[in-house]
Every structure is written in C-alpha cells, then in structure tokens.
C-alpha cells in the first residue's frame, strides 16, 4: 500500500468511528494496534490517548501532536465512509491529524530501522482537545516528564485556506477561550401582585444589555475580541414573576489584559443587579484554553520545512478567534509552533467550515503534512 492509500484507508476508518472527548477508547485501541504492528513502545498516561517514542541518532528530542477526539454533530455528508456513530462526527478534522501522525510514525520507524532517524521523537496522540483540555491533563499527569522535549509541533486542517497553502503566524495564532455563566435568584409572585416579587426577567435584560456593551465601551476597538452570549432563560410560567434567571456565553481574546477587563466588567454587572433589582446575581468563569503562542525562534525552521513540502506560506496578520488546547504545550512544556494546513477545494465541494456537518477534505493534503513533519525533523536546530 502506498502512502496515499495508507492515509485514505486509516483516515476513513477513523472518520467512520468517531468518539467524543475522554471517550476515545476504540480510537486509542486502533492507534495502539498500529504501534504494536511496528513494535513501537508507548505509554497511556490517561484512560485514552497514546504517547509513543522513538530514539534517534541525535541528542535533541522533539514532539509532534495530533488530537484524536470528535464532536457531538450529526454528519450530513453522503459518502461511503460517513460516521457510523449517531450524532458524533469528526467535524474538526482530527481524523486527518491522527492519520498524518500515524504515517509519520511509520516513516520514522523506517528511518530508525535503517539507522537514519536524526533525532529522538515523541508522538502525542492526544485525547480531549474539544472539551476536556487533554493537553493540560497529559502534562499534569507527568506524561512528558521522562522526555527532554525541546520543541512541540502541531497542525490543524483549515477549510478556509485552499489546498497547498499553509497559514502561520508568530506569537498568538489562536485566542483564549473562557466560558462564563450568570446565575440570578429573585422572588416569585403572581403577575397580579408583581410588586411583591423580585423579577429576574428585567434583571436578565439588564445583564444582556450590559454584556453587549463591554466590547463597545471597554475594549480597544483595534483588537479582535469576542464577548458572546450563547444562551439565556428566565422563569418557568407566563403568569408569574420569574424567580430565577440564567445566562451563559464565551469570551475569546488573545490578550490577557483584555480578558481581565471583561471579567472585571462582568463582576460589576453582577453587583449592579443586586442594587437595581434586589436580585442576587453571581457570575462564574470556567477557565478554558490560553492563547496559542507560536515561538518566533522556530519560525525559520517552520517556513523552510513548509516550502520544502510544496506548501505556499501565508503569514496571517491577526490570530484566529477560536480556542485550541495545543496552547498548553507552549505554555508549560517547550517552545511550540502550530500551523494551519489548507484543505479548501471548491471543485470537490470541500468548502464548509470546522464544526459543521459537511466538513470533508481530500486525504492527499495529509501527505504534505507528513512531508512537513519530516522536513522539520531532518533539519531541526535547537532554539
């Protein structure tokens, strides 16, 4: 089987059998069976996910990461390899990321067997990127303590860039992702005696209005930030004063100072609800992923490796505003660099975005990814 047949076979198998974050048991077994077939040793620090290692001839150790989880989305692609799991789909391309790393493992094993593997390589098949912070979990579990990793590399398919294009950016390339929730508690009464109640309905309207004004009045308009309201609710019946209210959303920013401003404003909003409406209001934050920071020291190696892989490099002027837990590797483990690989092909209908029910791409783009990985390995220099 040639390499294109390899990536097509394995990617489509994984696409048919997607699993949600922290439940990637079959996917993990599939990866382990593949590694076993190559006689490669590996560790499983968590219930799902795999860390493999190959010793090379050099003194440097570098790591490559692929995320392996899927999303709770009903696939609508009419293809033979459509998801066989109800309402679970590889709608973010992690099946491709995993497959590319599998083939790269095989290439590295062939090099090792020939005595030509230039450096030590750690292969990270990471669980729970979507909703579990799998990268942080692995680091906290000590998964990398025995490896003197000097750099971590990763990619993500990008349906907004054409095939043959690699999108890069030094410093911030993805935003932080922080969830927030407002909890309101008032006093119910019949609508005929509404003056005896403390309405969470009007209080929630106030919260909505104030949140929508944070971006306009408190953040620098030249920076890209998102303060998004995703869901809200007040009350249970049409003829009673609402005694409870709830609102939740997400904050996306690549500047820690801006995130602090948003949080401070939300705390002030919660305090104002008590004063204005006599309604208790609490805001809670679920810390998500920090911004992904690409080390400028790795830029030259990245760009050279991409060009040698026949990819055209596009330097993105601003970060993406979605979150990515690859950020934890650069924050806690070693200098890191994350690249987006274009998969858009209008002739083949591969045009829909990430996290959509029609996401798909041509497996041939994965060969470019593997060539990029190998170029990095062959020409790696410590930074």
Curated annotation (Swiss-Prot):
Gene3D superfamilies: 3.30.70.360, Zn peptidases. This is Uncharacterized hydrolase SACOL1433. Keywords: Hydrolase. GO terms for molecular function: hydrolase activity. Pfam families: M20_dimer (PF07687), Peptidase_M20 (PF01546). NCBIfam families: amidohydrolases. It is an enzyme of class 3 (hydrolase). The keyword Hydrolase applies.
């Amino acid at each position: 089987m040639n390499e294109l047949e390899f990536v097509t076979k394995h990617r489509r198998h994984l696409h048919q059998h997607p699993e949600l974050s922290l439940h990637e048991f079959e996917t993990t077994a599939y990866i382990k069976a593949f590694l076993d077939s190559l006689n490669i040793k590996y560790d499983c620090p968590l219930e799902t996910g795999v860390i493999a290692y190959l010793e090379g001839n050099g003194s440097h150790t570098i790591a490559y990461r692929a995320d392996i989880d899927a999303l709770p989305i009903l696939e609508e692609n009419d293809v033979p390899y459509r998801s066989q799991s109800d309402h679970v789909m590889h709608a973010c391309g992690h099946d491709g990321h995993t497959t590319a790393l599998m083939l790269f493992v095989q290439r590295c094993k062939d090099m090792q067997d020939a005595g030509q593997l230039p450096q030590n390589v750690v292969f990270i098949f990471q669980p729970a990127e979507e909703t579990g912070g799998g990268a942080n979990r692995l680091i906290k579990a000590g998964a990398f303590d025995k490896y003197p990793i000097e750099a971590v590399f990763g990619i993500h398919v990008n349906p907004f860039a054409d095939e043959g294009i690699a999108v890069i950016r030094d410093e911030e390339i993805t935003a932080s992702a922080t969830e927030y929730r407002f909890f309101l508690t008032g006093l119910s009464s019949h609508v005929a005696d509404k003056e005896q109640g403390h309405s969470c309905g009007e209080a929630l309207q106030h919260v909505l209005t104030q949140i929508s004004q944070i971006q306009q009045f408190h953040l620098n308009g030249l920076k890209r930030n998102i303060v998004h309201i995703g869901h809200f609710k007040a009350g249970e019946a049409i003829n009673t004063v609402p005694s409870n209210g709830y609102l939740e959303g997400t904050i996306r920013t690549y500047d820690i100072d801006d995130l602090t401003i948003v949080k401070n404003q939300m705390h002030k909003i919660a305090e104002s609800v008590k004063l204005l409406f006599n309604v208790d209001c609490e805001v809670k934050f679920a810390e998500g992923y920090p911004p992904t920071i690409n080390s400028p020291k790795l830029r030259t190696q990245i760009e050279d490796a991409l060009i040698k892989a026949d990819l055209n490099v596009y330097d993105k002027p601003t970060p993406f505003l979605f979150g990515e837990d690859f950020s934890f590797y650069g924050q806690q483990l070693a200098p890191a660099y994350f690249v987006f690989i274009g998969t858009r092909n209008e002739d083949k209908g591969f045009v829909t975005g990430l996290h959509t029910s029609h996401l798909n791409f041509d497996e041939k783009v994965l060969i470019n990814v593997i060539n990029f990985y190998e170029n990095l390995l062959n020409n790696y220099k410590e930074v």
